[in-house]
A protein has these predicted regions:
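Catalytic alpha/beta core domains of metabolic enzymes, predominantly
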Residues: 68-174
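Active-site beta->alpha loop and helix N-cap motifs at the rims of alpha/beta catalytic domains
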Residues: 1-59, 64
Length: 174
């Protein structure tokens, strides 16, 4: 079903997404090994890895091994930048050895709605006096800032927005 699009678009579309084991979130080696194994299942696999400290290390290693990673469970600009830098290091290491990166499709997914959820809880817990309407835009602000920096630095991974909570999220990202 997806393979024709994958072939036609040279790996940029037509990918099948699969998640590494969430229980490995603190185990860089385990995440990387899981991702590398999943990539052997089909040429169009996009492997999801968590943006934890261990996950970022695994993302670099898996990227180096030619795995198209979707860094997921990302909630902040600093996490998105750590992902971009890890992916760039993996791509550079791979390229330096003459290995192809042409069909790789590295992605970082920022969970905009979940970021909003966390900011609302934190604002309430810390008694921050803020217009409630602004709390629905934290994730979008995070996404837009990360996007600006990705463009400014020339980072190759694409940014995706996920976990929308309201219509404004979709309209603001598009």
């Amino acid at each position: 079903l997806l393979k024709p699009a994958f072939d036609r678009e040279r790996g940029k579309k037509g990918r099948l997404s699969i998640q590494t084991n969430p229980q490995l979130y603190r185990n860089a080696r385990g995440i990387a090994e899981h991702a590398i194994h999943f990539a052997t299942l089909a040429p169009n696999m996009q492997v999801k890895a968590p943006v934890t400290s261990a996950g970022v290390k695994a993302i670099e290693e898996a990227t180096y091994h030619g795995v198209s990673i979707n860094a997921t469970v990302c909630f902040s600009v600093s996490q998105a930048l750590a992902v971009a830098q890890a992916m760039e290091r993996g791509l550079e290491r791979r390229s330096a050895e003459g290995k192809s990166i042409a069909e790789m499709s590295p992605v970082c997914t920022i969970m905009v709605g979940r970021t909003d959820d966390w900011v609302k809880v934190a604002a309430k817990k810390n008694a921050v006096d803020i217009d409630p309407a602004f709390l629905d835009w934290a994730g979008i602000a995070c996404f837009k800032r990360a996007y600006e920096i990705y463009k400014e630095k020339g980072y190759r991974p694409r940014l995706l927005a996920a976990a929308y909570r309201h219509l404004g999220d979709r309209k603001s990202v598009v």
